Amino acid sequence: MGVNKNNVKIHVEHLKKNFGKLEVLKDVSTDIYEGEVVVILGPSGSGKSTFLRCLNRLEEITGGEVVVDGHDLTDKKTDLNKVRENVGMVFQHFNLFNNLNVMGNMMLAPVELKKASKAEAKERALHLLDRVGLAEKAEAYPAQLSGGQKQRVAIARALAMNPDIMLFDEPTSALDPEMVGEVLQVMKQLAADGMTMVVVTHEMGFAREVG
């Protein structure tokens, strides 16, 4: 599947973000199309993660416009929770719930937010765990998983909401080098399947592989 230039999934215009007097993002404008994989590179402290977090308004926006799937995130009338249901996010440190097993982590959002039945949510969770090569870990707890396995579960958990867009914030930087490949493989398959992806990283080789 290729990039659909007729469908802008994310439109950013003159985006500004300040932390107090510190200007982190200055007049950023871009369009991200359906099926496109955009890799954001740069050294630590250059505003990569801040930009990513503005795309689902986990960071408040100082100025400019961010439109996701036709919804203006700077408009007070926009239901941010509804928009976020269609934007999956994978964090550097996995952010799994340690008190829930893998299946519990996978089923929580679809059941609570999308009102899926437990049977539906379980079926989809098992399908996604199989897709990321972790079907046998459904009953395991996060403490029993390696870093690479945790990140693959985190990706599968985000996919459980059936998002149109996936945001990745430094998805491999907390992993041991030998575990990077297994996460990269899942992301490459997502890209091949036509998922719209925005990936923040400082690893050039990783960026070349995914982008």
Predicted regions and their residues:
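ABC family nucleotide-binding domain
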Residues: K5-G211
